[in-house]
Amino acid sequence: MKNFSLWCDFIENSFLDNEFLNLLSHGINGATSNPAIFKNAILNSPIYKDKILKLKGKKTKDIYEELAISDIQKAADKLAPLFYQKNDGFISIEIDPRLHDNTTLSLGEAKRLYSAISKENVMIKIPATKASYEVMYELMKNGISVNATLIFSLEQSQKCFEALNAGLVEFRKNNIALKEQNTRTPQAVISIFVSRFDRLLNPKAKEQNRIGILNANLAYNNIYSKNEPNIRALFASTGVKGDDLPKDYYIKELLFENSVNTAPLDAIEAFKGKMHFKKPLMNFEIYTELNQIISQSEREKACNDLLSDGLEQFCIAFEDILKAL
């Protein structure tokens, strides 16, 4: 399919040396991480125990960063051939989520992490809050690829695009001799969360497991219509809880061109060999169906609630790691 990319929403040190290589050989083109994923890896995998012991005496955040940066560097190296051959092959790492309402601290942390990792195919993950749009702009302007995350509303996706695109324009303006300098243009993804909508709104909806798909389709249309190939829609939160849906439901339903889907391992396994292009619905079709399922006020409230909840969950996961270290 034209410019569709499937990424793995998981990272763990030993996994990167084994199962991850198998996934890459079967068409996986990138990977993502978040505080919850690192919490699960660091606190539950024995491979980190010796590393943590050797780092004892350092500040807990420094220990976390050494562990996380090491994994991100390893993933970036495994993905490097895809990056240099196909301009894909990215791995994402999120800044400290507790900084989401502080522009200055977020920007400083993002630049510091990018410098410490020192890999071109790393995307710095920035939550889409009011304080963060300036961060996205500055990173793109400085040639640092960005994963704008925790997008639930059309308004968020639009503000993310505006910030990222403005930074991209400035980067290009400042790098007129781009080809001569061999400087790569930064890439960005706008991560639209999908299944969380359905888990929240299914009890109130007249049709089950459709709101997340329709909402994501709407944001995708907005991003795709801008015709900027360096800024793509990414569908996140595409795992299925329970047995009422196929594990790859949210991959198959959002199989759109020039998009990315980052999925958990069970969804990727279920999806193998099912690459069938899906035609996105047009906006008027989306709104017609949405209005039949649930009210606009309920959707808007859900966007705000899900963003607040997502920020809180990532902050808790991050603090849990630090407490355990």
Swiss-Prot record:
One example of a Gene Ontology biological process annotation: carbohydrate metabolic process
Record-linked PROSITE patterns: TRANSALDOLASE_1 (PS01054)
CC per GO annotation: cytoplasm
PANTHER family: TRANSALDOLASE (PTHR10683:SF31)
Family matches, as InterPro entries: Aldolase_TIM, TAL/FSA, Transaldolase_2, Transaldolase_AS
Signal peptide location: none
Entry keyword set: Cytoplasm, Pentose shunt, Schiff base, Transferase
Pathway named in the protein's UniProt entry: Carbohydrate degradation; pentose phosphate pathway; D-glyceraldehyde 3-phosphate and beta-D-fructose 6-phosphate from D-ribose 5-phosphate and D-xylulose 5-phosphate (non-oxidative stage): step 2/3
Protein name: Transaldolase
Classification via Pfam families: TAL_FSA
Residues annotated as the enzyme's active site: K125
NCBIfam families: PRK03903.1, tal_mycobact
E.C. designation(s): 2.2.1.2
Enzyme category, top tier: transferase
UniProt subcellular location: Cytoplasm
Reactions this protein catalyses: D-sedoheptulose 7-phosphate + D-glyceraldehyde 3-phosphate = D-erythrose 4-phosphate + beta-D-fructose 6-phosphate
Similarity field: Belongs to the transaldolase family. Type 2 subfamily.
SUPFAM superfamilies in the cross-refs: Aldolase
GO molecular function: transaldolase activity
Summary of the function given for this chain in its UniProt record: Transaldolase is important for the balance of metabolites in the pentose-phosphate pathway.
